[in-house]
Amino acid sequence: FCLSRGLGDVYKRQAIRKDLSLRPVEGVDGTANEGEILSVLHKYGITGPSVVLWGTGKPLREFLWSEEMADASVYIMEHVNFEDTYQKGTKDVRNCHINIGTGKEITIAALADLIVKETKYQGKVIFDSTKPDGTMRKLTDVSKLHALGWHHRIDIEEGVHKMYQWYLS
């Protein structure tokens, strides 16, 4: 789901939108192929009898299906004008950004459990609390996005299922 300013620039050149640009907040850099992903899984021991995850498993994360990132981005470019992004009747133009996400969070431990159940993994998941957890919470406020008419449709459970089915095929 690696959209960049370049995509926004191309979209603008096509004269569809002229007043918005899109930038990813975080995610895969867009260059990984299936072989690289599998080698990373192997490198970190995800093919063995146990998986060691850094931290306590308590941090909360939000996940968005990649195609929905694309869908939301196109929706914004086609349906949202810059003036829709700030409060009317004020001379201040503030808080004009639009967060794209689900607004729903899950702990790393719960996500690991979900993946274990989906994949029927028989090994053990071990949390190494001597390693850092990272930021304890990463959640986007999607209230503006919802007010503008776009909502995600694929929850984390369905996303994990779809990803695993893709991997198997």
Regions found by a protein language model. Give the residues of each.
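Single conserved hydrophobic/aromatic residue that forms the stacking wall/gate
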Residues: 1-11
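C-terminal substrate-binding subdomain of Rossmann-fold SDR/epimerase-dehydratase oxidoreductases
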Residues: 9-169
